């Protein structure tokens, strides 16, 4: 029996796939989403909006909006609002989007609002990097979190200051596209791989004739195509469903330093090595001792004396042998046998790679 690292060691064990479709391995160069951003106001909050004395931009935005609606707020008016919040609105402009198409938007508080639950986003223009308005957003916000507070205590589940509006924005301006204007199409691999790029080109050449595709580098495969959008759509519809026998992947271990999760693929292998690990813990405990003199008529003074205790413990440290492991199951058994915590495992893997015992690329994100 070996101790399971479930909960902090995530292992993705993939079965051998006979072939993958080109559509799953590549994307079409130039066919992508674009980011949109806007600033707006959320109203209708149940007393959980911005504190306007601490967020003057909320009051300024509200005054500007009211003036556009023909309502003038007297100068010097100190509006104490609790149902309004200033927010940033973001969205992704999909490729080939057409005027009138609805897209989802994400609404995020930028002030000190406690919650956006029950709020309504007022009409907000969404702009691109060229400062042009491409969509208008408005609607009721859906919040995935919940919270309650009373008597100085509070409970909160998930995030309350951010939400989503499904189909909350409408495209008002279309982006020009160069799709169909040239006589070539570039397929971009999801991951750099010279072998896979050559295999994709060979597969396309077998299906459409020699010279139809050529790998430009480890990420790009160029395909000859007829001009015209409809002709290139027909070409891609046939190419993307072709299957490619994927070669052996690079052995790779990914470590997330923030969450402590470790992910490795099936190509990871270990060489024999010995590992010693130890944990050093320091505990500091401080108590206040009150010393009161037993002289009620002598004018004594009560004195508070701090008493500090420091405890230092070191555990572990014994050498443990790690046997050679050629497959993922053996690697899992070898690492589980160490009984290491997630943070220990991160350090052990780094040391193994430095010692030449970990036959894999180590990436820390």
From Swiss-Prot:
Entry's Gene Ontology cellular component terms: bacterial-type flagellum basal body, distal rod, P ring; outer membrane-bounded periplasmic space
Xref: InterPro entries: Flag_FlgI (IPR001782)
Signal sequence interval, chain numbering: 1-19
Pfam family, one: FlgI
Molecular functions per Gene Ontology: structural molecule activity
Main localization of the protein described in the UniProt heading: periplasm
Keywords of the record: Bacterial flagellum, Periplasm, Signal
Subcellular localization(s) per the UniProt record: Periplasm; Bacterial flagellum basal body
A single GO BP: bacterial-type flagellum-dependent cell motility
Physiological role: Assembles around the rod to form the L-ring and probably protects the motor/basal body from shearing forces during rotation.
SUBUNIT field: The basal body constitutes a major portion of the flagellar organelle and consists of four rings (L,P,S, and M) mounted on a central rod.
Family: Belongs to the FlgI family.
The protein, known as: Flagellar P-ring protein
Organism whose genome encodes this protein: Cronobacter sakazakii (strain ATCC BAA-894)
Organism phylogeny: Bacteria, Pseudomonadati, Pseudomonadota, Gammaproteobacteria, Enterobacterales
């Amino acid at each position: 029996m070996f101790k399971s690292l479930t909960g902090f060691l995530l292992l993705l064990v993939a079965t051998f796939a006979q072939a993958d479709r080109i559509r799953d391995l590549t994307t079409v160069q130039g066919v992508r989403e674009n980011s949109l951003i806007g600033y707006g106001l959320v109203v209708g909050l149940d007393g959980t909006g911005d504190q306007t004395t601490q967020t003057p931009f909320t009051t300024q935005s509200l005054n500007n909006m009211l003036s556009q609606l023909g309502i003038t707020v007297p100068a010097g008016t100190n509006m104490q609002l609790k149902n309004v919040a200033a927010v940033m609105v973001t969205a992704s402009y999909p490729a080939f989007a057409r005027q009138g198409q609805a897209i989802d938007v994400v609404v995020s508080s930028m002030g000190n609002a406690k919650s956006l639950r029950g709020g309504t986003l007022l009409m907000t223009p969404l702009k691109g990097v060229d400062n042009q308005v491409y969509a208008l957003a408005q609607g009721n916000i859906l919040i995935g979190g919940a919270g309650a507070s009373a008597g100085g205590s509070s409970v909160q589940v998930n995030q309350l200051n951010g939400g989503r509006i499904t189909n909350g924005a409408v495209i008002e301006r279309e982006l020009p596209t160069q799709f169909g204007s040239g006589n070539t199409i570039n397929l971009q691999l999801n991951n750099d791989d010279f072998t896979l790029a050559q295999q994709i080109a060979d597969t396309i050449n077998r299906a459409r004739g020699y010279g139809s595709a050529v790998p430009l580098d480890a990420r790009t495969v160029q395909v000859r195509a007829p001009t015209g959008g409809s002709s290139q759509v027909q070409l891609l519809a046939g190419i993307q469903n072709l299957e490619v026998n994927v070669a052996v992947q690079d052995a790779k271990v990914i470590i997330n330093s923030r969450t402590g999760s470790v992910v490795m693929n099936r190509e990871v292998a270990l060489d024999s090595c010995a590992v010693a690990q130890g944990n050093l813990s320091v505990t500091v405990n401080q108590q206040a001792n009150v010393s009161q003199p037993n002289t009620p008529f002598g004018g004594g003074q009560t004195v508070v004396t701090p008493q500090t205790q420091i405890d230092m413990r070191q555990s572990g440290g014994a050498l443990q042998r790690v046997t050679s492991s050629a497959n993922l199951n053996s690697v899992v058994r070898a690492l589980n046998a160490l009984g290491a915590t997630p943070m220990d495992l991160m350090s052990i893997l780094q040391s193994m790679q430095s010692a030449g015992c970990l036959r894999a690329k180590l990436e820390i994100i």
